[in-house]
Amino acid sequence: MDRNSVTGLALIALIMIVWLQFMSPDKKPVIRESAKKAASVEQVNVPLKPAPVSASDAFGAFASAANGKARKMVVENDLFRATISSKGATLTSLVLKKHLDGALQPVQLVSNRADGALSLLFLTREGRKIDTRDLYFTGGSVDTLHTVTGKESYSVRYRLNVSKNRNILITYSFTGDSYRVGYDVQLNGFSSALAGNEYQLQWDGGLGYTEKNREDEAHNALAGAYLGGSLVKLDAAKDNQAYREEQSGEAKWVAVRNKYFVAALIPAGPTGGFYLDGSKKAGNEFENYLASLKMEVPVSGASLDNSFSLYMGPLDYDIVRAQKAELEKIMDFGWDWLTRPFAEYIILPVFSWMNKFIHNYGLIIIIFAFLIKLVTYPLSLASTKSMKKMAALQPMLKELQDKYKDNPAKLQSELGRIYKEAGVNPLGGCLPVVLQMPLLFAMFYVFRSSIELRQHGFLWAHDLSVPDSILNLGFTIPMYGDHIALMPILMAGTVFVQQKITPTAQTNDQMKIMLYMFPAMMLLFFNNMPSGLGLYYLMFNVFSVAQQFYINSTTTEADMPNVSIAAPARQKKKKSGGGK
């Protein structure tokens, strides 16, 4: 490995330092922060008057529905158990049956930060802010539990009577084998009753946290919307600050998410835009989010029907993409132009295909590392031969550097000639590493945020989506963390071995530094990374070491360059002449 190769590796290491520090959970960036407050939605989301003293003052025409008794019913399908309350016709609980939280209890998606997750929000002509969670609906089911399975379907309807000709109907539709729930809203007699001629359908309270590492989960929690082909994210990154984002137009969906789960509102028709809100209290990792769709109410017409779908479930790429609403855009796979294509079109499809036959993700990662090593073998072979040639050329290059130390232009010219005659590229040794960087970064995003690896163990690693900690230190070492993970130690050892057996130039101070510095940096980088990523890089290096032994044993003297330090003499042209 020559000076240029060392420089290239150092630059790659610098890129990793900057990138990994940027991605560190404890330095969480604000994804999108806006304090703009458009008047149309500001009226809906901010109280307009002091707290009233009576139901009539507070709710006006809705006062008759402000008192009642909440009745709850449970709808259970193959995937979740949903609880609906007649107060607000809202979801008060949604428990996923196939996923466990950090305490090994079924995941609860509805947080306790709000009195129910779903509601309609609107402003009356008299200036009263109405949230349907404050009102009591009739209807529902006389049964307290209804079970639906397979392809079976079940619907339940709630009704809110305001006056003789004015009412609200809300209908939930469940399917036995789906995370998707139909949600239909019918407004009768409201064409001239609402200020701004709009209402909002909102999910309030964010999502309940499910992981042991609350700080890491907060790093991934956010509210989002998809409008005009662009993803808008709102992240309540700082304590005691108001975060708001509002846009007009046709939103395809709004959603709130934590690290591995999402709740999304997907309209069947056009919308008037969206509104996102977020906050975080000091001393508490939980980030509270609200996401709402703005729906227009025509000034004419006796009734309005709007249909929506609710997706409440895991951030499983195949399931989320099957919603056909581009909801997969809320999954963070890094840069759209670089790492996301690797994640969506290589890593996830290959993992999904292999999982049909192999149900151990540790083995899948090992096989995937072998396949990548196999695909990159031609590059590795060319790189190794290039480095071996560079090593053979080092005495000649040193002689040239001494000979032309006072003539840089001549030195560069001679170096170029030597490289050309030998058929080597000074940076050829870095090429395989550079080409694998996008894949490595994409795997970081996949392993960090995809639910496929969550709570799947391998050997001593109990969960491939988190570090494989074998010892908690009780204190934090800067850039390293508060624990010792075994996978990064083994991986750093393979990096050291690989460098030792890789052809290099004559031993110099640069190479001695890189021999120890690069494994040390990798140890620091990977200690807080998902153990699945460490397993991939560990096995990739093991295969690289085996490959290097093979290449070293099959390279012959015939592969070495045969060049001279002296430039080839130019042949003199013969003079044309007559006879002898």
UniProtKB/Swiss-Prot annotation:
InterPro entries: Membr_insert_YidC, Membr_insert_YidC_N, YidC/ALB3/OXA1/COX18, YidC/Oxa/ALB_C, YidC_ALB_C, YidC_periplasmic_sf. The chain crosses the membrane at residues 5-25, 259-279, 362-382, 427-447, 477-497, 513-533. Its main location: membrane. The keyword DNA repair does not apply. GO terms for molecular function: membrane insertase activity. It is a multi-pass membrane protein. GO terms for biological process: protein insertion into membrane; protein transport. Keywords: Cell inner membrane, Cell membrane, Chaperone, Membrane, Protein transport, Transmembrane, Transmembrane helix, Transport. GO terms for cellular component: plasma membrane. It is found in: Cell inner membrane. Interacts with the Sec translocase complex via SecD. Specifically interacts with transmembrane segments of nascent integral membrane proteins during membrane integration. NCBIfam families: yidC_nterm, yidC_oxa1_cterm. Belongs to the OXA1/ALB3/YidC family. Type 1 subfamily. Required for the insertion and/or proper folding and/or complex formation of integral membrane proteins into the membrane. Involved in integration of membrane proteins that insert both dependently and independently of the Sec translocase complex, as well as at least some lipoproteins. Aids folding of multispanning membrane proteins. This is Membrane protein insertase YidC. It comes from Chlorobium phaeovibrioides (strain DSM 265 / 1930) (Prosthecochloris vibrioformis (strain DSM 265)). The lineage of its organism: Bacteria, Pseudomonadati, Chlorobiota, Chlorobiia, Chlorobiales.
